[in-house]
Amino acid sequence: MEKFELHILGCGSALPTTRHFATSQVVNLREKLFMIDCGEGAQMQLRRSRLKFSRLNHIFISHLHGDHCFGLLGLISTFGLLGRTADLHIHSPKGLEELFAPLLSFFCKTLAYKVFFHEFETKEPTLIYDDRSVAVTTIPLRHRIPCCGFLFEEKQRPNHIIRDMVDFYKVPVYELNRIKNGADFVTPEGEVIPNHRLTRPSAPARKYAYCSDTIYRPEIVEQIKGIDLLFHEATFAQTEQVRAKETHHTTAAQAAQIALNAEVKQLVIGHFSARYEDESVLLNEAAAIFPQTVLARENMCITINNYTDTRDYDPL
């Protein structure tokens, strides 16, 4: 099965702490890297997670609060110092290009690569990226400013050829692509060999959703129904529900309720408020509702294989 991993670079919220970096993640799908949000220190965390800068060509920004985008300028500058020549694409709600264009023109005048900004609306689900491996769609969220999450949907791989059966029926090589994609085979004598005799199904396509920052929003459940992995912000414990609503954030219990209602396979919670030195209170609160919950932590890597496992990278 081809690689589909989530790397947690940072899982803190707006106030910097010595425990957490600001929010940033990287999705590795078939060796293509996609960054989600880019808080301060993201480039340092890329190195610690042993991710290759050259494979990162698309960055998705959920909203224009500093803890989700202050790392962009440093990352763009570092790419330039490393001699990057490949285009970099940044996808965000409206306003990011207007904010960053003056900074780039001042600090990054000699870049040998182009930076393209792709801005989108946040009110409706919108397909914002599509290639042969993955489609990325926005998830409308409710925050104090326009904000959205992102749904990464792997493209279904073709069926696997059963070599012994292909040899038995003497299937020509030029027919194999058609058969992989579901076609039957007709022998020279006119016998129809059904596809299921010649192939076995590939593994089901996998899905990952990122939802931060947002007030409790049950409306997203249908869009993320049955996905393999959900990251949902859990800034506060339920005892701070009023504060969560005032600041347009979510409690751990509310994040777990979303996961439960959406029937996801695993939940990762993060974007922790700096007030919690012991985040087990958030984990316990969420796990009481949705047991398949884990706490995000820096340098965590989660493998998505229609089941999930986690590991940490030792910092370099």
From Swiss-Prot:
Zn(2+) 2 binds at residues 67-68, 213, 271. It catalyses: Endonucleolytic cleavage of RNA, removing extra 3' nucleotides from tRNA precursor, generating 3' termini of tRNAs. A 3'-hydroxy group is left at the tRNA terminus and a 5'-phosphoryl group is left at the trailer molecule. The keyword tRNA processing applies. Binds 2 Zn(2+) ions. Its cofactor is Zn(2+). Homodimer. Belongs to the RNase Z family. Zinc phosphodiesterase, which displays some tRNA 3'-processing endonuclease activity. Probably involved in tRNA maturation, by removing a 3'-trailer from precursor tRNA. This is Ribonuclease Z. It comes from Bacteroides thetaiotaomicron (strain ATCC 29148 / DSM 2079 / JCM 5827 / CCUG 10774 / NCTC 10582 / VPI-5482 / E50). The gene is rnz.
